[in-house]
Amino acid sequence: MSITTLAVPGVRGLTPYQPGKPIGELEREFALKRIVKLASNENPLGASPKVLEVVRRILGGTHLYPDGSGFELKAALAEKLGVEPAQIVLGNGSNDVLDLVARAFLTAGRNAVYSEYAFAVYPIATQTAGATGKTAPAHDGSRGPRFGHDLETMLERVDPDTRVVFIANPNNPTGTLLGRGELYSFLAALPEHVIAVVDEAYFEYARRPDHPDALEWLGEFPGLIVTRTFSKAYGLAGLRVGYAVTGVEIADLLNRARQPFNVNTLGLAAAAAALEDTGFLEATVQANDAGRSQLEAGFRERGFDFIPSAGNFVSFDLGRPATPVFDALLREGVIVRPLGNYGLPNHLRVSVGTAEEIDLFFAALDRVLVP
């Protein structure tokens, strides 16, 4: 008997999440001196100087457990977002919060619905909870933006056993964005037995006229959960801080399932400081707009189709299997993200970096594509 047969079926059938290749691993493998990492949608500006100052100040207290309630961070978030602290659930990154939702609402005999090309954590959280994942095909371009969520088809996938619908807006890895009217209509059409999770990890980057702020609808939809993170625009990916905002009753349920001390001392303090530095956030968004335009212009110049993005990354179609190009870029010291695991074997996703990093990426791409 294989020891793996003792595990629950949902875990046995999982494909592990593949993070971006670490810089240290590439240094060891190829003995490279200069490495450009554009794989994990991190903030190329780093973290706010105010955050770094706070972290240095509290390093001497790391032998103490953190505030398990996250009181100060929840108070700061509540004030900024116009909600009550009791509506907020803190997590070890927003992935932790997504997993909490699955553990609270999914089990064997229930299912979750999400879109094709949706964030890979949704099926992981769903299957680990023993539930079934139902994938709705994305738009093919005939009725909506290609690669975007087809909300009509997602709604058709909902049945009496559906308990959760996951929607990323903007979506990762495609960068596609749902407009205010279409997302509202979808939420209004969901039956009462379905929890709607709107994953807004890239919210701060998506400054489009029709971009919805799902927090505005919390009072109207009791089953709505909005998740956000400090890993992207706030530059705290290494400290792992995310959160959910929802109704008080759902927040209470999620907090019952939450592990004690799931957010560390440094993360709590850093996130609170990051919220205060609005100037750094604005600089981040402006730099991202410029970098995203630089990427799109480079792809356009080289004749590559790309998916217009509202996030801090752009995915493009090589027109050939992407893995060999990905491997060749690694040898050049450039780390990007292949999307074969998302069903896009010809695509690479490139995070927005500094202007210099983007130039280095395109120079490396040109070298590896020379016949």
Swiss-Prot record:
Modified residues (N6-(pyridoxal phosphate)lysine): 232
Entry keyword annotation includes Amino-acid biosynthesis: yes
Reaction equation(s) it catalyzes: L-histidinol phosphate + 2-oxoglutarate = 3-(imidazol-4-yl)-2-oxopropyl phosphate + L-glutamate
Keyword Signal: no
Keyword vocabulary terms for this entry: Amino-acid biosynthesis, Aminotransferase, Histidine biosynthesis, Pyridoxal phosphate, Transferase
Superkingdom per UniProt: Bacteria
Top EC class of this enzyme: transferase
UniProt-listed Enzyme Commission number(s): 2.6.1.9
GO molecular function: histidinol-phosphate transaminase activity; pyridoxal phosphate binding
Cofactor: pyridoxal 5'-phosphate
NCBIfam families: hisC
Family: Belongs to the class-II pyridoxal-phosphate-dependent aminotransferase family. Histidinol-phosphate aminotransferase subfamily.
UniProt subunit comment: Homodimer.
Protein name as annotated: Histidinol-phosphate aminotransferase 2
Organism: Methylococcus capsulatus (strain ATCC 33009 / NCIMB 11132 / Bath)
